[in-house]
Structures are given as structure tokens and as C-alpha cells.
């Protein structure tokens, strides 16, 4: 992306080692004059919070302090009503791989009629000094399908059918997913405030 502003662009570090998530943020923030990149590969931040918002805050502050750059963290996950909100904050740790996580969830819902679920995303933006600048969230409702569908996306995307669309995230192109996803909705709220911060 190239913006000729007569000055160097601000870096924004995405507090994640998940390549799929980083790429999604690069696309979501493509209209803003920023250099968006993932955190250093060696950097690991332990998610010790009990909520998405708390984990996002922990990650944003840690990555900002470690890199000396502005950092944006997202903690997101899938909550299934009939499983008491699981996997919730443990979505990424529900099993070792995306395939295993999807398989485990489908197995747990084998005999369950109520398959309603929602994705939540909590965002936290921290300054280069590690101060919290913004905290926002987004939510997308849907149901868990009985089998994986589609070839795009990552994580639970193949088994999450977005309410009112008849499509899983994995069946959507990236533009449609950006418009409807929990992360896309949260970033939409973030952008006006982020622009003000960059202009100040």
C-alpha cells in the first residue's frame, strides 16, 4: 500500500501470530495510511484474562511495550449457547489445530438441536508506550452447521453459518466476510477514532 504524505507512515502492530487474523486486519485497515504488520514471531503473550476484552488489553499493552509501536489486539471467539458459552475465551485453545477444534465442536453438538452461536471480537488499541487508547467490540450471530462448508477463512469459519445469509464464513469471499464478521464490525467502529488519533 502506498500513501505519499510527505512523512513516514505510522506502524501498527497486530498483536497476534495468527497469519489468517493478521491478513484480515491488513485488509480491514487498507484504507488508512498505516504500515500494518504482525507482532515479532518470537513474541508470545500469555492470555490470562477471563474475558475477550481483558485478553485483548493484555496483548495490546504487552506488544506495544515490547515493540515500541502502536499495537492493536483482538481477542475473539465463538460462544455456543447450548454449551454454556463454550468454547468462549478458550476458542483458540479448544484443541491443537483448526481441524481438531472444528471436529471437537461438531462432536459435542452431535445430539444437540439448539445450534445457535455467536462470534465476539474485543479490540484494544495501545499507544507505543503501552497506554490503552481505545477498546471496542463486535458481534456476529449465527448457527453451527452439521458439517464444514466452504474453502475460505480459518478457525471455525467452515462451521459458522451467519444469520440471514445461509452461508458459512468459509463460503463467503473476503469482502462479504469483512462486512459481516464480528471483527469487521468492531474495526468499523474503530476506524473513525483511529483516524483522529493519527491526525492528532
Curated annotation (Swiss-Prot):
Active site, renumbered: 75
Alphabetically ordered keywords of this record: Hydrolase, Magnesium, Metal-binding, Nucleotide metabolism, Nucleotide-binding
Lineage top rank: taxon: Bacteria
SUPFAM superfamilies tied to this protein: ITPase-like
Pfam families tied to this protein: Ham1p_like
UniProt keyword Protein transport present: no
GO cellular component annotations of the record: cytosol
Positions that bind substrate: 16-21, 76, 154-157, 177, 182-183
Catalytic activity: XTP + H2O = XMP + diphosphate + H(+); dITP + H2O = dIMP + diphosphate + H(+); ITP + H2O = IMP + diphosphate + H(+)
GO molecular function (one): ITP diphosphatase activity
Entry function: Pyrophosphatase that catalyzes the hydrolysis of nucleoside triphosphates to their monophosphate derivatives, with a high preference for the non-canonical purine nucleotides XTP (xanthosine triphosphate), dITP (deoxyinosine triphosphate) and ITP. Seems to function as a house-cleaning enzyme that removes non-canonical purine nucleotides from the nucleotide pool, thus preventing their incorporation into DNA/RNA and avoiding chromosomal lesions.
Record-stated family: Belongs to the HAM1 NTPase family.
Protein's name in the database: dITP/XTP pyrophosphatase
Organism phylogeny: Bacteria, Bacillati, Cyanobacteriota, Cyanophyceae, Synechococcales
